[in-house]
Amino acid sequence: MNIRGIILEGYSNSGKTSLLRALKRYQAQDEASESSVVILGEHYSQILHNVHGKFVRLSREQHLDLLKSRVDLIKPLNDWANFLGPGRRKSRGLFFILERFHLNHRAAFPEADEIEITELEKQLCELGANCILLTLSNEKAEERIKSRNPDEWVGKPREDMEQACEDLIETQNNLRIQAAKSLVPTKEINTDRKDWNEYARLIMEDYGFA
């Protein structure tokens, strides 16, 4: 197989963007790694979008179409590499990273028919995708939420923070449930320590994605 990929899933404060940067650095420093890389952040795959200053939430069908279009961007690249035949990973290989993808969809539409998202997951598996679900310990939720935008919480009622923590914990649990249903192989990483470089090494070496 000429292609491999990582899908980063998790709540807003779990560290997806920080880990994405660390993975980019790790892959770039490996002399034998792929020269061809496709990285799509969450703005290319999430459900809620800021469109010209207004927040727009995609329907289930719209979001499925969006995810399918992203996979359809990657598949022809892999087909071309396969057409060329065997070759070194550096020259013929393709490495991709996607953020907030199939698990985000499953968690947002848990009661929907799974046929279409399962078919998409089959295609992701054929493209060598592995999913990393980033989570926090419950007791770290408040600290992580505050660390992102400290000024935002100044003067706010305590109840607002309690609700934000509940939302984080509930979303994490929902993502775990959906990961168990998904066809895409998934590993969970607790990001309490914020050791992004070590998490990247763990993914690329110890988990056998390298």
Predicted regions and their residues:
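Hydrophobic anchor at the beta1->P-loop junction of P-loop NTPases
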Residues: L8
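P-loop (Walker A) phosphate-binding loop of NTP-binding proteins
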Residues: Y11
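Conserved glycine(s) of the Walker
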Residues: G15
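Conserved Walker
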Residues: S18
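Conserved substrate/cofactor phosphate-moiety recognition/catalytic segment
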Residues: R21-G87, A108-F109
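Glycine-rich phosphate-binding loop used to anchor ATP phosphates in small-molecule kinases
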Residues: D65-L127
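A glycine- and Lys/Arg-enriched "phosphate-lid" helix/loop adjacent to the NTP-binding pocket
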Residues: K122-N174
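NTP-dependent small-molecule kinase module
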Residues: T171-A210
